[in-house]
Amino acid sequence: MASAVQTVCGQAYGAKKYAAMGIICQRAIVLHLGAAVLLTFLYCYSDAVLQAIGQSKSIAEQAQVFARGLIPQLYAFALSCPMQRFLQAQNIVNPLAFMSVGVFLLHILFTWLIIDIMGYGLLGASLTLSLSWWLLVILNGLYIVLSPSCKETWTGLSFKAFKGIWPYFKLTAASAVMLWYIYFSFSI
């Protein structure tokens, strides 16, 4: 779904319709948050789903513990992907790389502390992933709001993001199907 952000934002950037880029990013965030809500139910009941497709009970139970710890990550991912595509469409990639490396290094430290030192195990591992993604969202958001590089493209939150959401949804759905088809065809 996020690949549509890069396409549409890239077109807006090329057409010098800079203010439209922020609206496109917000529209994508709204759709991604909707998808995250739907996926939350799958994560909550992953034990039953996994057992229904033949996974053993013990593995399904452990997978559910891990999946439930990843629920906050779903929402962070819903925010992060459109923001990253928004920045990439403007050729702002070095700050993204620096933020990602910084969060990765903190993630290593957090994982060691939470799993090895504090002993939180599987749930700790998934919650650490969620924490790291939220740190990345915060850094990306601060960069977008505070950086002079985004002054023309980010004009603040707007209700315009809800206008034209259905055509944008159709574009993102088509993009997701296309990417799934490409992935599936190469895995055969």
What is each stretch, according to the model?
Residues 50-57, 113-120, 176, 180-188:
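Helix-terminus/linker motif at the lipid-water interface of multi-pass membrane proteins
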Residues 22-35, 41-45, 57-83, 98, 105, 170-174, 178, ...:
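Alpha-helical transmembrane segments of multi-pass membrane proteins
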Residues 122, 126-132, 138-186:
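Interhelical loop/hinge segments that connect adjacent transmembrane helices in multipass membrane
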Residues 1-40, 80-89, 96:
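Small-residue-rich hydrophobic transmembrane alpha-helices
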Residues 1-4, 40-41, 74-82, 86-90, ...:
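Hydrophobic alpha-helical transmembrane bundles that constitute the permease/transmembrane domains
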Residues 60-61, 94-138, 142-146:
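Membrane-interface helix-loop junctions in multi-pass transport and translocation proteins
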